[in-house]
Amino acid sequence: MRAEIQTIVADIEKSLDLLAQRMNWETAEFRLEEFNARVEDPNLWDDPAAAQKLMRDRQSLVDAMDTYKSIRQDLQDSVELIELGEMEEDAEVVKDAEDTLKALKEKAAQKELEALLDGETDPNDAFLEIKAGAGGTEACDWASMLARMYVRWAESRGFSVELQEEQAGAEAGIKSATYQIKGHNAYGWLKSESGTHRLVRISPFGKGTRETSFAAVGAYPVIDDNIEIEVNPADIRIDTYRSSGAGGQHVNTTDSAVRITHEPTGIVVTSSEKSQHQNRDIAMKALKSRLYQLELDRRNAEVNALHEAKGDAGWGNQIRSYVMQPYQMVKDLRTNHETADTKGVLDGDLDGFMAATLAMKVAGKSRADAQGED
């Protein structure tokens, strides 16, 4: 077996070892038996929220076990085919099996990363909020570029994207926009994107000068029914208004848009679908997501530090820099992960940055756990 293929096999084995460690493979079968026994309980659905959580936890374990077994079996089959092909000097069989191993390596690495998304709300859908910061028209244009980037990233993963609210810029781009990203682990991936994003480029608005623009990104989990968030009606103010857009036959011309302000925290959420009733539901769901995240921030120092970086979109709160002039470079200031493929990133190729941030957080948690055991 060629040295390159031996390295690929070793990489897959490493990913499998980490997958087994994350799911605690030694006790997985026992835990699945426990889940199955509880599912058979005739009183299970007396508590619907607990039942739904149990079913999700069970399915998550089943999926993890099936993935591990599938990758392990495919690895074994491919290695055996290569060895057989080499014995029989069948180059075509060897090449096909090697190609399978290369694809399997990518799959194993991806599943290894997904296994790290083990937060309570990591599997949930996400609200993604983008706001233009310092820089006027330049910043509004930059905010629209970020919106396009995230939409393309989400679509490349098979997630669905719904625009909940958008406020157009005075001359170009957007002042703000809120999306709901629907898909498994949507929040788990997007939570690392919260913070200020900085762009350096030559102005496209006729100035010909190098400009620096900022936009703030915030990601919040869509809260499932099993997580209860109480909102005191006395604490909120609900306003209706006419939605503003770029115009055209589909623009919302009724006073159906809804803005909800949570007085104690100052949180403001909006929705501008055609139905006012639907807008109230969407905006209230977004408010509960924000309040839930706020509570997590209070209890979790790491998350708190991350979300404090979402403050004013300016120099002091950057998480990532996108430079288009005088050179091409996108660099994450937390992990130092970087690439010269600026176009690829702006077209939605964000997985490398998200993976680097996730790996950094897991490594930090592991160090903290180790220190706690000392």
Curated annotation (Swiss-Prot):
PROSITE patterns: RF_PROK_I. The modification N5-methylglutamine is found at residue 249. Keywords: Cytoplasm, Methylation, Protein biosynthesis. The keyword Oxidoreductase does not apply. Its main location: cytoplasm. Pfam families: PCRF, RF-1. Gene3D superfamilies: 3.30.160.20, 3.30.70.1660, Release factor. InterPro entries: PCRF, Pep_chain_release_fac_I, Pep_chain_release_fac_I_sf, PrfB. GO terms for cellular component: cytoplasm. Transmembrane segments: none annotated. It is found in: Cytoplasm. The keyword Protein biosynthesis applies. Methylated by PrmC. Methylation increases the termination efficiency of RF2. It comes from the Bacteria. One of its GO terms (molecular function) is translation release factor activity, codon specific. Belongs to the prokaryotic/mitochondrial release factor family. Peptide chain release factor 2 directs the termination of translation in response to the peptide chain termination codons UGA and UAA. NCBIfam families: prfB. This is Peptide chain release factor 2. It comes from Ruegeria sp. (strain TM1040) (Silicibacter sp.). The gene is prfB.
